[in-house]
C-alpha cells in the first residue's frame, strides 16, 4: 500500500489529505495520505520515518527551507527557489522537488489567466519566491514588493527582478498576493483598492477565506481573478505524479479541496 503524508506545523486544517484521497481513489490506487504535525525540531526524525515507510511526502510551513539540508538530492529548481515542497523516497534515499512554481503556472493556464507582464508579486517569502521564479522563467517582466523593502531588494537582486513601491501596482497586468494578508483578518487587503490597475488579472494565494477582500475588490474593478485553490490543486497533482507517474485530475482535486473547505 502506498503511504503519503503532509508534514508541517500546524497541519490539522490542511486540505492535502482530501485532495490526495481523491487522487488515490480516482486512479484506483490503494494507499493513504496522512497529516503529520511536524514542528521544525521534529523534522530530522520524521524524515527517518519517511525513508523507512513512505513513498513520498509534501512539506509545508515551516519546513520547506529547512528540509534541503536533510535530503539526498534536490532539484535545480528547488535549489534556486530555496524551498522543497515535495519529497520522493526511493530505496531509502530522499529526493526533493518544488511543484509550487510549475503548479502556479499550470493554474494560470487552466484558469485562462494571460501570462502578460509586468507582473507584480506582493511578498518576498517562500510563496513569493516560488511565484516570482515561475513568472521569470515564463519570460515575464517581474516586479516584487515586500513590507520590508530589504527583503524585496534581496529577492530582486538574486533573481534579476525589480523591487518596486506599492504604487507601481497600477501599471501591472498581473498581480499576485503571496503574503498572508487576508488570512488572519478577512477584512484586510494587501493593496488599497485605488491602486488596482485598470486591466489585467489578480491572483490571491490565500484560500481561507476563499474570496478575500483583495479578490472581491479586483472583481468589482472588472479584473480577471483567481483564488488560491487552483495552484494548491496543481502543485498537489504534480507532486502525485512525481510519486506515482500518474497525473490525477487537478480540477477534481480542487473540488475535493472546496468540499473540505465547506464552500
Swiss-Prot record:
Reactions catalysed, as given in the entry: shikimate + NADP(+) = 3-dehydroshikimate + NADPH + H(+)
UniProt-annotated binding residues for NADP(+): 123-127, 146-151, 205, 228
Record-listed shikimate binding positions: 14-16, 60, 85, 100, 207
One GO cellular component, as annotated: cytosol
Single GO biological process annotation from the record: aromatic amino acid family biosynthetic process
GO molecular function annotations of the record: NADP binding; shikimate 3-dehydrogenase (NADP+) activity
Oligomeric and partner information: Homodimer.
Entry EC number(s): 1.1.1.25
Keyword Amino-acid biosynthesis among record annotations: yes
Gene that specifies this protein: aroE
Pathway in which the depicted protein is active: Metabolic intermediate biosynthesis; chorismate biosynthesis; chorismate from D-erythrose 4-phosphate and phosphoenolpyruvate: step 4/7
Active-site residue list: 64 (proton acceptor)
Protein name: Shikimate dehydrogenase (NADP(+))
Family from the record: Belongs to the shikimate dehydrogenase family.
This protein's record includes keyword Cell cycle: no
Keywords of the record: Amino-acid biosynthesis, Aromatic amino acid biosynthesis, NADP, Oxidoreductase
Coiled coil: none
InterPro entries the record matches: Aminoacid_DH-like_N_sf (IPR046346), NAD(P)-bd_dom_sf (IPR036291), SDH_C (IPR041121), Shikimate_DH (IPR011342), Shikimate_DH-bd_N (IPR013708), Shikimate_DH_fam (IPR022893), Shikm_DH/Glu-tRNA_Rdtase (IPR006151)
UniProt cross-references to SUPFAM superfamilies, sorted A to Z: Aminoacid dehydrogenase-like, N-terminal domain (SSF53223), NAD(P)-binding Rossmann-fold domains (SSF51735)
Its job: Involved in the biosynthesis of the chorismate, which leads to the biosynthesis of aromatic amino acids. Catalyzes the reversible NADPH linked reduction of 3-dehydroshikimate (DHSA) to yield shikimate (SA).
Amino acid at each position: 500500500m502506498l503511504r503519503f503524508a503532509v508534514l508541517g506545523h500546524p497541519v490539522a486544517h490542511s486540505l492535502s489529505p482530501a485532495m490526495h484521497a481523491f487522487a488515490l481513489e480516482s486512479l484506483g490506487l490503494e494507499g493513504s495520505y496522512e497529516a503529520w504535525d511536524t514542528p521544525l525540531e521534529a523534522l530530522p526524525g520524521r524524515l527517518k520515518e519517511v525513508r523507512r515507510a513512505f513513498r513520498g511526502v509534501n512539506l509545508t510551513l515551516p519546513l520547506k527551507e529547512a528540509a534541503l539540508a536533510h535530503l539526498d538530492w534536490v532539484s535545480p529548481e528547488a535549489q534556486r527557489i530555496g524551498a522543497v515542497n515535495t519529497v520522493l523516497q526511493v530505496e531509502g534515499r530522499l529526493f526533493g522537488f518544488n511543484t509550487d512554481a510549475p503548479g502556479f503556472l499550470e493554474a494560470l493556464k487552466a484558469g485562462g489567466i494571460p501570462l502578460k507582464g509586468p507582473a507584480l508579486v506582493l511578498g518576498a517569502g517562500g510563496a513569493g519566491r516560488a511565484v516570482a521564479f515561475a513568472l521569470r522563467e515564463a519570460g515575464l517582466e517581474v516586479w516584487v514588493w515586500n513590507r520590508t523593502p530589504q527583503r524585496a531588494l534581496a529577492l530582486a537582486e538574486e533573481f534579476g527582478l525589480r523591487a518596486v513601491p506599492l504604487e507601481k501596482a497600477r501599471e501591472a497586468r498581473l498581480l499576485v498576493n503571496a503574503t498572508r494578508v487576508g488570512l488572519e483578518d478577512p477584512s484586510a487587503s494587501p493593496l488599497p483598492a485605488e491602486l488596482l490597475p485598470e486591466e489585467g488579472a489578480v491572483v490571491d494565494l490565500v484560500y481561507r477565506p476563499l474570496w478575500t477582500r483583495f479578490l472581491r475588490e479586483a472583481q468589482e474593478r472588472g479584473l480577471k481573478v483567481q483564488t488560491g485553490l487552483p495552484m494548491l490543486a496543481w502543485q498537489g497533482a504534480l507532486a502525485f505524479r512525481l510519486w506515482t507517474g500518474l497525473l490525477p485530475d487537478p480540477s477534481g482535486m480542487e473540488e475535493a479541496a472546496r468540499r473540505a473547505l465547506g464552500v
